[in-house]
Amino acid sequence: MPRLSAAVIYLLVILGVSALVALAWQAYPVSGSQRLRCQPACAQADLRSRNLAAADLSYTDLSWATLESANLRGATFLLSVLSGANLRESNLQSADFSNARLDRVDMRRAILVDANLRATDLRSADLREADLRSADLRGAQMSDVRLERANMQGVLLIDAQLERADLYRADLRNADLRQANLREANLRMANLDGADLTGADLAGALLPHGYTEPLLQSDEEP
């Protein structure tokens, strides 16, 4: 096999480095605006720890992207695809995910206070220990979602599909779960004080100790 000359090797190294720089650069926000150079095709982009507050990421493919610990407060993800994305410990307060695809997303310990997740696809998402206080999840598809120990005080889950969802030790105080589908959901040790489950489907669900269907009133002495 012929040996490569030093000049050829040097050229290959330069080309390789240039390609890596180009890939890294496209993930940064464009100067003076909160959009990404890679938009609308940002699949698998590495955006960890980036400051993207109030960014407009609508209609963007961010599937399998890494957004861990990113500041996305007030960002917009209208109709975006984030399937399998890593949003662990990211700040998503007041973010708008209207009609976005978030299936299999990793949002463990993410901040989603006041976030708009209405009609989103969150099937098989991991939201363990996430802060979802006052988030809007009306009509969301959440079958097989993991919400263990999540803070869901005051969350709106009207008409949400939560079949087989794991809500072990979730804080659901004052949550609105009217007409929600909770078939075979795990609600053991969940705090349901003040929650509204009018019309909710609890068939096969594991309920907190001391609670029974259909009105989910506590059987324990006050």
Model features per residue range: what roles?
Residues Y28-P222:
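Tandem repeat scaffolds
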Residues V8-Q26:
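Hydrophobic membrane-insertion alpha-helices, especially the h-region
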